[in-house]
């Protein structure tokens, strides 16, 4: 199982300040604990500011076919928004980010592991369940799982022709992140102080 926990309110409002926001709630699968009441309370506060263009609540956004069908019904409201705020596990955020290529997609939750069955997703996206989601700084691409070295402070310098030096069949995660940030006009995120990975949140050391 895994648990999604809301990021600090200050962290979320710093993302939404001055922006029109479309909100996506994923109630998850049975393997995910979603903070539904806390999320609803925060979203009510955001909506009171008059900047929420719409809210979509569904499940299994990690399934691309299901997610695409749901999003199409809300596309006009999504296009009005400057930012799409996703309340889900890290896999769900990455799925939405891949589909909405021209939009800034941000995670409202951190994901933590709980011993036991981890659920099934039909996608290649991976969430390390690190409890300190980096997706808001990296354009919706997880540096922990997209980089074979799990670097969080940028490219190692060993990639060649866009491929990882550890696995020549693997695309460099940080080159993917750079391209994604450039596409959405967020290269400034690379200038943010590095969010040092706290390994004490990892399942292996608990």
Where are these regions (language model features)?
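Iron-sulfur (Fe-S) cluster-binding modules
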Residues: 1-62, 71-84, 97-137, 141-206
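N-terminal glycine-rich "phosphate-gripper" loop used for MgATP/nucleotide binding
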Residues: 86-90
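Short, well-ordered alpha-helical microsegments
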Residues: 92-95
